[in-house]
Amino acid sequence: KKNHSITLMPAIDFLMASVDWTPKDLDRIVVAEGPGSYTGLRIAVATAKTLAHTLNIELVGMSSLLALVPYQQEGLFVPLMDARRNNVYAGFYENAKPVMPEAHLPFERVIELIKGASQVTFVGEVGPFIEQIQEHLPRTNYKETLPNAANLALLAWDTEADSLHDFVPNYLKRVEAEENWLKNHTESGESYIKRL
């Protein structure tokens, strides 16, 4: 059951208590900015922004895909998040630096993009794509991984802080309701989101 809005703050309190920290010990908040679950990203980003604002400390957003990549590893890493219907959110990293923009795309396109690369490792939600990896890229490595917050913290150490008030999640894709709405309102000039 997903109750992040209920369990997130108690989890943060527990983690801080387990290392004998108080909020005053923090000098920066690092948050996975997306892609990912729309609701999960909104909750995480709202919590991170609130903490950073309340404590008057820096906020740094880091890619959720980068959180799937092992820290300080050689070669091309392609983190995947299953986006349903054989689509993925994918990143392309060497030494934790992007070599191509992150994207929401069909998995077949990912295969095309990396076909000539050597020493490629797929990480993240690779399970649904193992057969295709083995068929099209038999010499490619793959490993199911979970996001690693410690890796993000290390990578964010010397990353420039984001503007607290301008920071928004990086969804990489519109929600299905917005895509459907846009199909029916292509020429009206109306905005899907109405300002109050």
Question: Which residues fall in each region the model found?
Answer:
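DPxDG-like acidic metal-binding loop motif
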Residues: 28-59
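Surface "functional belts" at beta-alpha junctions
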Residues: 3, 58-147, 176, 193-194
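Acyltransferase
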Residues: 142-196
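Generic hydrophobic alpha-helical segments
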Residues: 8, 12-15, 19, 69, ...
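Residues at secondary-structure transition points
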Residues: 2-10, 38-42, 46, 143-147
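N-terminal beta-alpha supersecondary unit
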Residues: 1-33
